[in-house]
Amino acid sequence: MPTGCKPPRIYPRGLSGRQVLSQNRTHVRFICISMSATRSPRTAHTSAPTRRQASGRTLQKGQQTKAAIIDAALGLATHIGLEGLSIGALAEVTGMSKSGVFAHFGSREELQISVVREYHQRFEQEVFYPALDEPRGLPRLRAMFAYWMKRSSVEIDSGCIYISGAIEFDEQPGPVRDALADSVREWLAAMRRAIVQCQEMGQLHAQTDPDQMLFEIHGLILALHYEARFLRKEGSIERALASFDHILRRAGAQFDAAT
């Protein structure tokens, strides 16, 4: 071959140089597409957890924000009542926009119901569950009333949503009133069960009417709030505790007054 001359290109039989070049380009495109398709599942696999984690963080932040709003709303409701709650007032207290507060509830009514549920949950944690640590019978019944009184003594200054809500929604049928009534019924039913357990264990007279006894005990709490909060009478808590012991003794309970 002469120096400086390029070797002749040899193409497959029946194909021109242009056709071979076209085929090569097709092969290159096919290889690129194949490699991209092979990598895409791996990319999707690694990005999916990232999206889930981001979604989880967003959900957690939203729940924390909603809990903070409910906490602020509960603080307001104990002083101005459930009817005094408004999206605008909460937006001002929390430093959020009205639309931001509204987005977590959708309506003022749903906000009020959320506050009732939060109040009931805290009531259970402070009154009902601690009393369950006591043995069944008189120890548990007395513990339930003692924790109830303890919470009531704090609420003399702040207010009890069960009591104020009953006045606000007495003649307003609807979901908020239902949520309030259901919460009160649930607690009173727990008190009634404790009374019946005392009877079953022989610590109270069998002929004692549990509903009558529950009525009188509940009446003590209502009287305490009226006299201590509205009339500002001193000694109201002591009289309520003494009256509770009288109710138990009248029903046949035997215990040391100092316990």
Short names for language-model regions:
Residues 114, 127-158, 210-217:
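Hydrophobic alpha-helical connector segments
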Residues 28-80, 84-93, 110-113:
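Basic, helix-initiating cap at the start of DNA-binding domains
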Residues 4, 8-56, 143-150, 185-201, ...:
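C-terminal peripheral helix-coil segments that are non-catalytic and often amphipathic
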Residues 140, 154-175:
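Amphipathic alpha-helical segments used for helix-helix packing
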Residues 99:
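Key DNA-contact positions within bacterial/archaeal DNA-binding proteins
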Residues 72-73, 94, 198, 214:
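Small-residue (primarily alanine) positions within well-ordered alpha-helices
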Residues 178-183, 200-216, 235, 239:
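All-alpha amphipathic helical-bundle segments outside canonical DNA-binding/catalytic cores
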Residues 63-71, 78, 83-84, 95, ...:
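An amphipathic alpha-helix adjacent to DNA-recognition modules
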